Structures are given as C-alpha cells and as structure tokens.
A protein has these predicted regions:
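Short, contiguous, helix-prone interaction/anchoring segments in small proteins
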Residues: 33-66
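Phosphoinositide-binding peripheral membrane targeting modules
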Residues: 55-94
C-alpha cells in the first residue's frame, strides 16, 4: 500500500502500524545496529508506481526502514514523500544486474552503486528478519 506521507496523518500512522507493526524502540534499534538504510538510488519503478517518478530528469532516491512485521520503503518526489508499507509475507527480493523489491504487484529496482554496496549489510538484516518471520508460519516436517 502506497501512502502520501508528506504531512502527519494519524490515520496513516495507525494503518502503517497495523500492516508492518510498530517501530523498534531506541535501545532495540541500537542493539540491531540500526533499523534504517542509507539513501538508495532507484533505477526503475513498476508501471503502477510511475506516479512517484520525478517528472524532470532527476535521480529518484528511496530509504528503507525495518519494522517488526515488515518494511517501509520511503520515496521522495520533489517536496512530496511517499511510503510503501510491505509486510514480510509479501516481500520478495530479486538480485540480478540490479536488486529489486517486489510486493503487491509492484516493484522498485535499485542501482548497484556505491550507496547500494554500503547498504548490503542492512539488506541482509532484512532478509534474515523475513526468514525468521516465515519460520514462525512454516509447516512442521513429517
């Protein structure tokens, strides 16, 4: 679900917490070594996310925030902010020439730039959290 979070909205805050859980506390964030990514360069959006693309030939940036039950992908378009809430059970990573995040019939492709390489440890942390989440709901082996 993509929301326009430019201005504070209590309904959006509650909706985001229902989808991906509450944010981690201060000490938990320190213990994890951070819960947010650095700025990532967006190469491409899916056709149903093209309304977020900058209209001028400018670089699109995104940040990722880890939550208890999912992630938030925050995208800046000019002076507007958009937040894409993705629960872990819908989250899929693809790695090829570029890395992309797929969920809810949408995707974002990130460029393999210097900023992406700085975020590799954080992306592995997200993947580990997703694996832990999936293990809670896996079927027992017979």
């Amino acid at each position: 679900m993509v929301l326009d979070t430019t201005y504070h909205n209590k309904e959006y805050k509650q909706l985001i917490e229902d989808i991906v859980g509450e944010p981690f506390g201060f000490f938990e964030a320190l213990r994890r070594g951070g819960i947010g990514s650095k700025r990532l360069i967006v190469n491409n959006f899916s056709p149903n996310l093209n309304f977020i693309t900058n209209s001028v030939s400018d670089i699109n940036y995104a940040n990722i925030e880890l939550r208890k039950q999912g992630i938030l992908v925050m995208i800046n378009k000019g002076l507007k902010n958009f937040t894409w809430a993705i629960p872990f059970y819908q989250l899929v990573f693809y790695k090829s020439d570029m890395t992309s995040i797929h969920a809810q019939g949408k995707f974002i492709q990130f460029a393999n730039s210097k900023t992406f390489k700085e975020n590799k440890k954080f992306l592995y942390q997200i993947m580990n959290e997703k694996i832990k989440f999936d293990e809670k709901y896996s079927f027992p082996q017979l």
